[in-house]
Amino acid sequence: MDPNDAFSAAHPFRWDLGPPAPAPVPPPPPPPPPPPPANVPRELEELVAGYGVRMSTVARISELGFTASTLLAMTERELDDMMAALAGLFRWDLLLGERFGLRAALRAERGRLMSLGGRHHGHQSGSTVDGASQEVLSDEHDMAGSGGMGDDDNGRRMVTGKKQAKKGSAARKGKKARRKKVDDLRLDMQEDEMDCCDEDGGGGSESTESSAGGGGGERQREHPFVVTEPGEVARAKKNGLDYLFHLYEQCRLFLLQVQSMAKLHGHKSPTKVTNQVFRYAKKVGASYINKPKMRHYVHCYALHCLDEEASDALRRAYKARGENVGAWRQACYAPLVDISARHGFDIDAVFAAHPRLAIWYVPTRLRQLCHQARSSHAAAAAALPPPLF
């Protein structure tokens, strides 16, 4: 007899050991580190490599605060403004090949990012559409099960629609504000570049000045001018010509203040009324003084300074005829051309010789009229027969 059977017979109760326990499952290996995303823009040096852009130019662009992501998000017009600022602020000689090379590098990088992110974006958009469709189906199923839309649901949906409308209007207002800031920055850079060109030689064209607008920020409301006689106060909410000429005297005082502060700090002081003077005037509260308006009537102020009697007579004549200020402004050109004829049609010398006009740039239109008068005078002199002796 087997001893185990005897033990089993003597002790009917014993532990049932059962099958052996399985071995513990080893933990899964840690996931590999995620690869760097391929749709991230490269550094600016890598982006322009091979496109003929010098490293010194890249360094200047970086000093202005531009990165590769910023340049990729900019439009062609904004790129032109950036290059103009680079040439105006740093006096940097940007080569023609560098301009085209930078644009070509940005186009290539945009194409690379679009090709890399297109597939991933398509996958995400598909899953997003599926999720949205599932939500719509679940909402319809709940509505069908409950027998329609209740009053509470209707009220909540109306409130949600109002909130979305408010969010949309706020987003549109924010977009307009950002666009206005960009336009103001672009205008400031264009004005700075125009002043640099004026200092090198010659003033800016009147069409550019009139289309440039009033500069950044909101100004106080400026009422229109009317033709008034000397000493006459304009009625209603309008300003007379004496007030207009007073603005030019204020600009001269602001220029003196800017020059004294520049000398005090050891900076280069302007010799003419530039954007620096207009910005200072706005800073001290004289926001009614702006560059387009002052450049628009500078030849009228010149006639007032050079020949005050002729200016007063012209004002009285146009006031008696009921002409507007635009017609009076155009009529101020002819006396100035006659004055320049006494000095060899050199209107720049006429401005430079007068202490109150030397701080203003000669309008391009006035310079053109003097040049045409000089040409006509020379042609008429050449057509005369020689004297007989």
From Swiss-Prot:
Q: Which Gene3D superfamilies match?
A: Protein LEAFY
> What keywords are annotated for this sequence in UniProt?
Activator, Developmental protein, Differentiation, DNA-binding, Flowering, Nucleus, Transcription, Transcription regulation
An annotated GO cellular component of this protein is:
nucleus
Extract the ranges annotated as region (Disordered): 1-41, 140-226
Where does this chain mainly localize? Answer: nucleus
Q: Which tissues is this protein detected in according to the database?
A: In very young panicle but not in mature florets, mature leaves, roots or apical meristems.
Q: What InterPro entries is this protein classified in? A: FLO/LFY_C, FLO_LFY, Floricaula/leafy_C_sf, LFY_SAM
What is reported when this gene is inactivated? Several abnormal phenotypes in the vegetative and reproductive phases including short plastochron, late flowering, small panicles, reduced meristems size, aberrant floral organ identities and loss of floral meristem determinacy. Reduced panicles size is associated with reduced number of primary branches due to the precocious formation of spikelet meristems.
Q: Where is the composition biased (Pro residues)?
A: 19-39
Composition bias, kind Basic residues: at what positions?
159-180
Acidic residues composition-biased segments: 190-201
Could you state a single Gene Ontology molecular function term?
DNA binding
Where would I look for the motif Nuclear localization signal in this sequence?
161-168
* DNA-binding region in chain numbering: 221-225, 290-297, 361-364
Marked site (Interaction with DNA) residue numbers: K268, N275, R279, G326
Task: Give GO BP annotations, semicolon-separated.
Answer: cell differentiation; flower development; maintenance of meristem identity; regulation of developmental vegetative growth; regulation of DNA-templated transcription; regulation of flower development
**Known partners and oligomeric status:** Interacts with APO1.
- Hey, which family's this protein in? Belongs to the FLO/LFY family.
* PANTHER family linked to this entry: PROTEIN LEAFY
**What is the protein's given name?**
Probable transcription factor FL
